[in-house]
Amino acid sequence: MKGISRMSIREVSEVLNTEPSEEFLKACAQDERLGIQNLIVRYYKEWEARLVEAERIEALLREEKQLWLNGYLHIAGIDEAGRGPLAGPVVAATCILPAKFNLPGLNDSKKLTESKREKLFQQIKEQAIGYAVGSAEPAEIDGLNILQATKLAMKRAVEGLKVRPHFLLIDALELPSLKIPQKGIIDGDALSASIAAASILAKVSRDHLMGELDKLYPEYGFAKNKGYGTREHLMALRRHGVSPIHRRSFAPVQQQLDIV
């Protein structure tokens, strides 16, 4: 490699985007060109951000690492999406992550933008040892109640795994019907990498499904509101009545049925 003084700013930038040596970084720091100084400042800011992110991901693996040390190889995180909406199913997902993965930005799905969730959704499916999605339909929610329907969706997700889980980490709940060692963690989607991954799979899977249901029932705006009781959704309920995918046991829907 030619000396840095003979390199253009573009050439220096290309080297910094690889894995520059300490010698090269020192040479950049000593170069008086403003463009090089800006590049080296940006390089160290990005390096520090990557370090902080690596430490955050490491903290998210605290539960998993302890379980791995205790001999549990396949740890399945479980979470749900859609307990609160007035329409559509409640969807659960389960995900078994490998010990080494590359999922920058992995977090509770509620803390991510839609575009970031979509990106991680694909990355998780590519890198996971195993994953599966389960759901409970509106009629099941009405017949059981939302809590029991959520547990049913979670159970179906676990049963859909092609890889047998040795331990379950579940967001906030426990599933006594599954005879698998397990632990419920309050705010688990913000504390466990496996649960965070499951939360993204559940959220994006449900969002995609609501987009498809919007094509069947376009008058309710499901692609936008995902079934939640927005002002526009409530107005559509009053105008068009209750659809086959509305949860009849939920108060705003029940009120509309009572009017009819």
Swiss-Prot record:
Q: Which cofactor does it need?
A: Mn(2+); Mg(2+)
Q: Where in or outside the cell?
A: Cytoplasm
Residue ranges occupied by any RNase H type-2 domain in the UniProt entry: 73-260
Q: Which InterPro entries match?
A: RNase_HII (IPR022898), RNase_HII/HIII (IPR001352), RNase_HII/HIII_dom (IPR024567), RNaseH-like_sf (IPR012337), RNaseH_sf (IPR036397)
Annotated a divalent metal cation binding lies at: 79-80, 171
Q: Which domain of life is it from?
A: Bacteria
SUPFAM superfamilies (alphabetical): Ribonuclease H-like
Extract the GO molecular function terms from the UniProt entry.
Answer: manganese ion binding; RNA binding; RNA-DNA hybrid ribonuclease activity
Please provide the Gene Ontology terms (biological process) for this protein: DNA replication, removal of RNA primer; mismatch repair
Q: Provide the alphabetized UniProt keywords.
A: Cytoplasm, Endonuclease, Hydrolase, Manganese, Metal-binding, Nuclease
Question: What is the enzyme's class at the highest EC level?
Answer: hydrolase
Q: Which reaction does it catalyse?
A: Endonucleolytic cleavage to 5'-phosphomonoester
One GO cellular component this record assigns the protein to is: cytoplasm
- Give the main location: cytoplasm
| PROSITE patterns (UniProt xref) | RNASE_H_2
Query: Where in the chain are disulfide-linked cysteines found?
Result: none
- The enzyme's E.C. designation: 3.1.26.4
**What's noted on cofactor binding?**
Manganese or magnesium. Binds 1 divalent metal ion per monomer in the absence of substrate. May bind a second metal ion after substrate binding.
What does this protein do, in the record's words?
A: Endonuclease that specifically degrades the RNA of RNA-DNA hybrids.
Q: Which family does it belong to?
A: Belongs to the RNase HII family.
The entry's protein name is: Ribonuclease HII
Highest classification ranks of the organism: Bacteria, Bacillati, Bacillota, Clostridia, Eubacteriales
